[in-house]
Amino acid sequence: LTKTTGVFDATTVAAVRSFRDKWGFYGEPIVTAGVFKRLDVLTHNHGHLPKACLTPKKVICVDMTQRVLRLVQLRKTVLTTDARFGTSQNPTVKGVFKVYRKDVRHVSSAYKTPMPYSMFFNGGSAVHFSPYFLADGYYGASHGCVNIRDLAVAKRLFRVTSIGTPVVIYAS
């Protein structure tokens, strides 16, 4: 989180747009009771981690409700980034998995799309950078993978993640 500056500048405008895109707040310039209730539901358990994430080991924790991926080490969040998931036709499966394969330049054989910095955790499902998520934001979806839109974060996560690292996917 950043400090409040009292200035509504280009950085603030970009942050508000990003928030609106992530949560679908359009045409709602006034915080009504309904908007406030939605905000409360979305942020009520912000940062709450399930027991499977609170181990002495390094864990990739993916909260599908908050739409974030957190890297947790020694029971503390050391990295947080936006994430997006599959659709009802191609869902991202909830559960506890382990990274079993890493591929820096993977291309999907099923969809012929790039999946750079892939960390596979369940069959063909992986945590990976998505140039489409970067370009389209939350308007698109994956085919069951966990997409990361920040390339630098994906590279860092790939570098510090080992085979066998737990991946916990849940809804808070």
Functional labels for PLM-detected ranges:
Residues 80-82, 96-98, 166:
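Well-ordered beta-strand positions in beta-sheet-rich domains
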Residues 13, 17, 36, 66, ...:
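Extracytoplasmic/secreted envelope proteins and their assembly/folding machinery
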Residues 26-27, 45-55, 90-94, 103-172:
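Exported/periplasmic cell-wall-interacting domains
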Residues 48-87:
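A structural motif detector for short, solvent-exposed N-terminal "entry" segments of globular domains
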Residues 69, 99, 119:
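Conserved hydrophobic/aromatic pocket- or pore-lining residues that grip, position, or stack substrates
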Residues 1-39:
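Short acidic, glycine/serine/threonine-rich helix-capping segments at coil-helix boundaries
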